[in-house]
C-alpha cells in the first residue's frame, strides 16, 4: 500500500498537545533511541536547524567561570584521543576560546594577508573535501531537502510553495478547529478525507492521490519526500499525531483524522498548485535532472543563494551576469583560499605545526560536529562537579519541625521551600505534582474530564466534584458571564461584523483592553467582585456500586438518545427511548430510521460499554485508597514523626491574555493546576478508615491540609480549613503567616531576574496585565533534578534551577520507590528540559517565535501572522531576554542520593530512563554518601568526580 510510505515518513514526528492542556515535550522524542550527539546531527540535517548555541555563547560562560577550565581540558583531551589527533590540549583550548568564536573574521584577515602562502595540495584537498569537485553530489544532496514546489520557486523565482502552504494551512486549521471560528467547515463529522474530498470535489482515495503524485513527479524516494512534507507542516502534523494516538479525545471522536490522509491531501494540493502556477518547462524530477545537466552552475548558485552560502558580492553578480561558470569558480576559489590561508595561519601561529592537513581535519571535525558538543559537555560536567560536592555534605537537623510541607518537584517550588525552611523550622518534601493520585476529574460545573496525571499516562479512575452548597447564585452569575463571552466571541470571529462590534460593544472592549493594560490592578478588583464565587465542594472518591453504575449509565444514554432525536426534530416517546436503549445494550436490531439517527450522533454499543466502564471507574475502593496513601508517603520518605499539620501544596499559575498559561501550570497534572490532586490526596489521608489499614502510623491529631502555590505571584492559598480544630487555630494562623513571609521573600528574590520589575507588587501586577509578555519565567533555566533527602540540599541556594524530589534510599529495600521516580518524575523533567533546550537553540524551528506575532488558531495552538506552521515549542520571551538567552540550554543533570550499586540496579530495571541515561539525553550523577563519593555516568561508565 502506498500509504505505508507516508506512515513510515511520519515516524519522526513527536506529539504536540493542544494549548488548553499544554505539555512540555521533546521535539526529537523519536530520536531518543540514538545517542544525544548523533540525534542532534541527524536533526540538524533533517530540519535544517541549529542544534547548539553559537561557540561565542559557550565562551562567554567560560569567561564568567561557569565552565570549569579542568572540565574543558579533560574533554579536549578525550576528544583528541578518540579522534587520533596529535595536538596540545592547551593550544586547542586557545583555539576554542580565542579564535573559533570569530572564525569568519579570522578567515577574512588571513585571506587579506599576502604574506601567507598556501601549498597547492591543501587547496586541492579542501576543494575535494567540500565536494566542490563533484557538483552532481552537491546537487543530489541539496534537492533531497526540498519539495518540488520549493525547487521551482528557487530556480525560477516563483511563488508556488507559499500559495500551496497557505491554502493547506487554511483548510487544516478549519478542520481541526475546536470552537474558535463561528463558520465551521462542512462535512467535518465524516472524517478528514471525506471532508477534504467533498470540499475539493474529488472522487479519489488517498492511495489514488499518492500514486498520481508519484507518476506525475517521479520523486527519487516517496518516503523521503513525504518526510519533508511533514516537516514543512511539523506542528500541524505533530498535533494530528497526538489526536490519532489519544483514545477518546472528544474532537478526534467527533471529527477523525490521521496522518496518512493529511499527507495525501498535501500531495494533492501541491500537485494542483504546481500544475496551475508553474511557468517553467520543468514538470517533474526527470525534467529537473535534464535542466540541471544543461545549467549546472546556475542551479548550484541558486541553491547556494537560498541556503545562504553565497556571499552578497556573488549574489549581486548572479543577477547582473549570466557567466555562471565564472561566478561559481571565482566564488569557490575564494572560499577555498580563505579557508586554506586560515589553516596555514592557525598551524603556524597557534599549533606550531607544518602538517596543514591535520590542522584542517581538526578544525573541520570541531566545526562540523564536535566543538559545541564539547562545550556543552564541559558545562554540564562543571555543574555536576560543583553541585555534587554540595550535595555530598551531610547536615543534621535535631529540632522537631513545626509542620511538614509537601510541594511539587517543579523548579519554581525551590525558592519557596528554601525560604519557608529559613522562616522557621519546617521540613519540606518534593513529589510529582499529581501527588500520587492519577485521576480524571469532572468538575461540578463542567461537562468534560480533566486528565490530572502525566501526559504519557491515561488515568483509569474518575473522580466527581460535588457541591455541598446551593449553586443557584453561582450558576446565575456564571451564565451571565458565559452569555456575554459568547456574544463577544461570536462578533470577534465573524469577519463581517467588526463594525457592529465596535458600535455596539466598544465600551466593553475598551474596558478590557485599556483597563487591563493601563490599570490592571483596578480592573482585577472589579473582575473579582463580578466573578461568581464557586460553592464548597467535596470529591466523590469512594467507588460506586454495580447497581449505581447501571443506573447512571442508563440515565446518561437515555438523555443522549432523547437529545439526538430532539435535535433531528423527531418526536419520540419515553417508552420508545427505553426500548432503543434496551436494544442498544443487548446488541439487538434497531429500526433503520432510528439507527440512522444513532449513527449520526455516534450512539453505539461500543460507546455504551465505554461509558459503563467510566462509571465503573468512578472512585476508589478502600483498599485502593490505602495503597495510594501508602505509596505516596513511602515515595517521599514520610513514614514517622508526623507533626500536627502536614500541608500538601500543589501549584498553578494565573496570567491574562496568555495562550501559554497552561504551560505554566503543572506538567505532572497534564498541564492543569495541582489543586484537585492535593485536595483528593488530603481527603484520602484524613480518612479514619484509611489510616487504620496503613502500615505507617499517622497520629489521630495529624491533619492534612491542601494548598495551592500561585507560581506567578508566589501567593499561597489553603483550602478545607474547616478541618482545623478550634484549639489549633492560633497555630494554624501562625503557619499561614510563615507561608506569607516565605512567599514575600520568594517574590523579592525573583525580582532580580524579571525585566522591568522594580518592587514585589510588580510581580503580582504582571499576572493581570494584558500587555505583559513575560508574567513569570516559568521553568526557564532548569538545570537538574535532585532525588534525595531535603537535609542534603538545605544549605544550598539552587535559584529555582532544580526539580526536587524527596527520596530516602534506606526505606527503599527493593528499589521499587526509586524505579517509580525514574519512570515518572524524571521523564517529565527530561521532557521539560528538552523542550527548553531546543526552544532556545533554534526558537524559530523548535520554539514558537515571538509572542508579538502570535495569533491563536483553532483554539489548539498559535501561529505567526496570518499563516504559518502550528508552533510547537516555547515563545521567544520564555527563553530569551533582550536578545540574550535567559535559559541555559544543557541536558538534564539527574543527581540521585543513594549507593552507586543501588542506583545502577534500579536504573537497569527500567526501559526508557535507562535508554536516556545510556544515550546521554540525561546526565546521571550518583551521590553515594556511604562511600562519601560522587559518580558521573559518562561514555558508558561511571567515573568518580
UniProtKB/Swiss-Prot annotation:
Required co-factors: Zn(2+)
Cell compartment(s), UniProt: Cell inner membrane
Gene Ontology annotations for the cellular component aspect, listed alphabetically: plasma membrane
One annotated GO molecular function: zinc ion binding
Record's bilayer topology term: Peripheral membrane protein
Main location: membrane
Ligand binding (Zn(2+)): 408, 410, 651, 666
Transmembrane regions listed in the UniProt entry: none
InterPro entries: DabA
Highest taxon of source: Bacteria
Keywords annotated in UniProt: Cell inner membrane, Cell membrane, Membrane, Metal-binding, Transport, Zinc
Protein's UniProt keywords contain NAD: no
Subunit record text: Forms a complex with DabB.
Functional description taken from the UniProt entry: Part of an energy-coupled inorganic carbon pump.
Family annotation (PANTHER family): INORGANIC CARBON TRANSPORTER SUBUNIT DABA-RELATED (PTHR38344:SF1), UPF0753 PROTEIN AQ_863 (PTHR38344)
UniProt-listed HAMAP family: DabA (MF_01871)
Family to which the UniProt record says this protein belongs: Belongs to the inorganic carbon transporter (TC 9.A.2) DabA family.
Identification of the protein by name: Probable inorganic carbon transporter subunit DabA
Source organism of the structure: Sulfurihydrogenibium azorense (strain DSM 15241 / OCM 825 / Az-Fu1)
Amino acid at each position: 500500500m502506498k500509504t505505508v510510505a507516508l506512515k513510515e515518513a511520519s515516524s519522526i514526528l513527536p506529539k504536540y498537545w493542544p494549548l488548553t492542556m499544554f505539555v512540555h515535550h521533546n521535539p526529537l522524542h523519536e530520536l531518543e533511541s540514538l545517542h544525544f550527539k548523533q540525534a542532534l546531527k541527524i536533526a540538524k540535517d533533517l530540519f535544517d536547524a541549529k542544534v547548539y548555541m553559537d561557540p561565542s555563547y559557550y565562551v562567554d560562560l567560560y569567561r564568567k567561570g561557569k565552565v570549569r577550565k579542568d572540565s574543558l581540558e579533560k574533554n579536549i583531551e578525550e576528544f583528541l584521543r578518540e579522534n587520533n589527533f596529535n595536538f596540545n590540549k592547551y593550544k586547542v583550548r586557545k583555539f576554542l576560546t580565542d579564535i573559533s568564536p570569530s572564525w569568519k573574521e579570522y578567515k577574512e584577515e588571513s585571506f587579506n594577508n599576502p604574506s601567507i602562502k598556501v601549498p597547492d595540495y591543501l587547496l586541492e584537498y579542501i576543494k575535494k573535501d567540500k565536494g566542490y569537485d563533484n557538483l552532481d553530489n552537491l546537487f543530489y544532496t541539496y534537492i533531497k531537502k526540498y519539495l518540488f514546489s520549493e525547487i521551482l520557486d528557487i530556480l525560477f523565482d516563483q511563488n508556488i510553495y507559499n500559495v500551496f502552504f497557505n491554502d493547506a494551512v487554511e483548510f487544516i486549521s478549519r478542520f481541526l478547529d475546536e470552537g474558535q471560528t463561528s463558520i465551521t467547515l462542512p462535512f467535518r463529522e465524516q472524517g478528514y478525507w471525506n471532508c477534504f474530498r467533498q470540499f475539493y470535489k474529488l472522487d479519489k482515495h488517498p492511495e489514488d492521490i499518492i500514486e498520481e503524485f508519484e507518476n506525475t513527479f517521479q520523486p527519487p524516494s516517496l518516503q523521503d519526500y513525504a518526510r519533508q512534507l511533514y516537516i514543512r507542516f511539523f506542528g500541524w502534523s505533530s498535533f494530528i499525531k497526538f489526536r490519532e494516538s489519544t483514545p477518546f479525545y472528544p474532537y478526534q471522536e467527533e471529527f477523525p483524522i490521521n496522518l496518512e490522509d493529511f499527507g495525501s491531501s498535501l500531495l494533492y494540493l501541491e500537485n494542483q498548485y504546481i500544475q496551475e502556477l508553474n511557468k517553467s518547462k520543468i514538470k517533474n524530477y526527470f525534467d529537473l535532472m535534464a535542466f540541471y545537466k544543461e545549467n549546472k552552475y546556475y542551479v548550484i548558485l541558486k541553491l547556494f543563494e537560498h541556503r545562504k552560502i553565497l556571499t552578497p558580492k556573488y549574489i549581486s553578480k548572479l543577477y547582473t551576469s549570466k557567466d555562471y561558470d565564472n561566478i561559481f569558480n571565482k566564488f569557490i576559489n575564494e572560499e577555498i583560499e580563505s579557508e586554506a590561508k586560515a589553516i596555514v595561519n592557525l598551524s603556524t601561529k597557534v599549533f606550531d605545526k607544518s602538517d596543514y592537513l591535520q590542522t584542517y581535519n581538526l578544525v573541520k571535525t570541531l566545526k562540523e560536529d564536535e566543538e559545541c558538543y564539547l562545550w556543552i559537555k564541559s558545562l554540564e560536567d562543571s555543574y555536576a562537579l560543583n553541585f555534587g560536592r554540595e550535595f555530598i555534605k551531610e547536615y543534621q537537623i535535631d529540632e522537631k519541625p513545626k509542620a511538614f510541607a509537601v510541594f511539587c518537584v517543579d523548579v519554581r517550588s525551590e525558592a519557596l521551600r528554601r525560604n519557608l525552611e529559613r522562616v522557621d523550622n519546617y521540613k519540606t518534601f518534593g513529589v510529582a505534582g499529581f501527588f500520587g493520585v492519577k485521576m480524571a476529574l469532572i468538575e461540578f460545573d463542567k461537562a468534560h474530564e480533566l486528565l490530572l496525571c502525566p501526559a504519557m499516562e491515561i488515568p483509569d479512575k474518575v473522580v466527581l466534584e460535588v457541591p455541598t452548597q446551593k449553586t443557584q447564585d453561582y450558576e446565575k452569575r456564571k451564565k451571565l458571564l458565559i452569555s456575554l463571552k459568547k456574544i463577544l466571541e461570536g462578533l470577534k470571529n465573524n469577519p463581517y461584523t467588526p463594525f457592529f462590534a465596535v458600535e455596539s460593544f466598544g465600551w466593553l472592549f475598551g474596558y478590557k483592553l485599556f483597563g487591563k493594560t493601563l490599570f490592571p490592578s483596578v480592573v482585577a478588583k472589579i473582575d473579582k467582585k463580578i466573578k461568581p464565587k464557586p460553592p464548597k465542594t467535596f470529591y466523590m472518591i469512594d467507588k460506586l456500586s454495580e447497581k449505581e453504575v447501571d443506573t447512571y449509565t442508563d440515565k446518561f444514554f437515555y438523555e443522549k438518545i432523547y437529545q439526538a432525536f430532539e435535535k433531528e426534530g423527531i418526536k419520540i416517546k419515553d417508552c420508545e427511548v427505553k426500548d432503543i436503549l434496551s436494544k442498544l445494550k443487548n446488541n439487538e436490531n434497531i429500526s433503520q430510521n432510528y439507527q440512522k439517527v444513532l449513527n449520526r450522533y455516534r450512539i453505539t454499543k461500543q460507546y455504551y460499554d465505554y461509558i459503563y466502564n467510566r462509571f465503573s471507574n468512578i472512585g476508589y475502593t478502600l483498599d485502593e485508597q490505602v495503597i495510594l496513601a501508602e505509596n505516596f508517603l513511602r515515595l517521599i520518605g514520610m513514614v514517622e514523626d508526623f507533626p500536627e499539620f502536614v500541608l500538601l501544596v500543589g501549584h498553578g499559575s494565573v496570567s491574562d491574555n496568555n495562550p501559554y498559561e497552561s504551560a505554566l501550570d503543572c506538567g505532572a497534572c497534564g498541564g492543569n493546576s495541582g489543586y484537585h490532586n492535593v485536595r483528593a490526596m488530603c481527603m484520602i489521608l484524613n480518612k479514619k478508615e484509611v489510616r487504620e489499614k496503613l502500615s505507617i502510623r499517622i497520629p489521630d491529631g495529624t491533619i492534612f491540609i491542601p494548598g495551592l502555590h500561585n507560581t506567578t505571584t508566589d501567593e499561597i492559598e489553603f483550602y478545607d480549613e474547616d478541618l482545623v480544630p478550634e484549639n489549633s487555630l492560633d497555630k494554624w494562623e501562625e503557619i499561614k503567616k510563615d507561608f506569607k513571609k516565605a512567599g514575600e521573600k520568594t517574590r523579592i528574590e525573583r525580582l532580580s531576574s524579571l525585566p522591568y520589575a522594580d518592587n514585589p507588587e510588580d510581580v503580582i501586577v504582571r499576572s493581570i496585565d494584558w500587555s505583559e509578555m513575560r508574567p513569570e519565567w516559568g521553568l526557564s533555566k532548569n538545570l537538574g533534578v535532585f532525588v534525595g533527602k531535603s537535609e542534603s540540599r538545605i544549605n544550598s541556594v539552587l535559584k529555582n534551577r532544580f526539580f526536587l524530589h524527596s527520596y530516602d534510599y534506606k526505606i527503599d529495600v527493593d528499589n521499587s520507590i526509586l524505579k517509580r521516580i525514574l519512570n515518572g518524575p524524571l521523564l517529565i523533567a527530561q521532557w521539560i528540559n528538552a523542550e527548553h533546550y531546543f526552544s532556545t537553540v533554534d526558537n524559530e524551528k523548535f520554539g514558537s517565535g515571538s509572542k508579538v506575532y502570535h495569533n491563536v488558531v483553532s483554539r489548539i495552538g498559535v501561529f505567526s501572522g496570518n499563516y504559518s506552521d502550528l508552533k510547537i515549542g516555547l515563545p521567544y520571551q520564555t527563553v530569551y531576554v533582550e536578545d540574550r538567552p535567559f535559559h541555559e540550554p544543557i541536558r538534564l543533570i539527574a543527581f540521585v542520593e543513594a549507593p552507586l550499586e543501588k542506583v545502577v540496579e534500579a536504573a537497569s530495571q527500567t526501559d526508557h530512563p535507562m535508554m536516556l541515561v545510556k544515550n546521554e539525553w540525561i546526565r546521571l550523577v550518583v551521590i553515594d554518601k556511604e562511600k562519601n563519593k560522587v559518580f558521573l555516568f559518562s561514555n558508558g561508565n561511571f567515573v568518580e568526580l
